[in-house]
Amino acid sequence: MNITLIAHDKKKELMIQFCTAYKSILSKHTLSATATTGRMVADATGLPVSLFMARSQGGYQQIDARVAYNEIDMVFIFTDPNANDPWEEQCILQTIHQCDTHNVPVATNLASAEMLILG
């Protein structure tokens, strides 16, 4: 399964903790992530992570295209509900819209991510 990881700056540590806790499950899948999140997860866990461009360089658009072409099976987006960045919020909403359009499961917080990863 192809799983994509995205995390706002204030949620990157939570994404690392999630990936560490579920490393044995995630290691059986192909992981990809936006640039900074992917590097941090790979460095902390040793899991191989393919990197998309950074958010500001079009990383979300790359992910959206992969979702549209059915190349991504699941997306974890750990968002900061207190972030005040309208552009970032629009990118997240577009990615969620793509997931909904193409029937790709998406988790936007730790509880929903655990439900998806545990099946």
Q: Whereabouts are the PLM-identified features?
A:
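Mid-chain, well-packed structural core segment of small domains
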Residues: G59-H97
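Metallocofactor- and cofactor-centric catalytic cores in central/energy metabolism, strongly enriched
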Residues: I6, L31, Q61-Q62
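Short hydrophobic/aromatic-enriched beta-strand-loop microsegments
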Residues: T30, L47-Q57
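Ser/Thr/Gly-rich flexible loops in soluble cytosolic domains mediating phosphotransfer, phosphorylation
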Residues: I92-G119
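Histidine-anchored nucleotide/phosphate-binding helix
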Residues: E13-S24
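Short internal beta-strands
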Residues: K28-T37
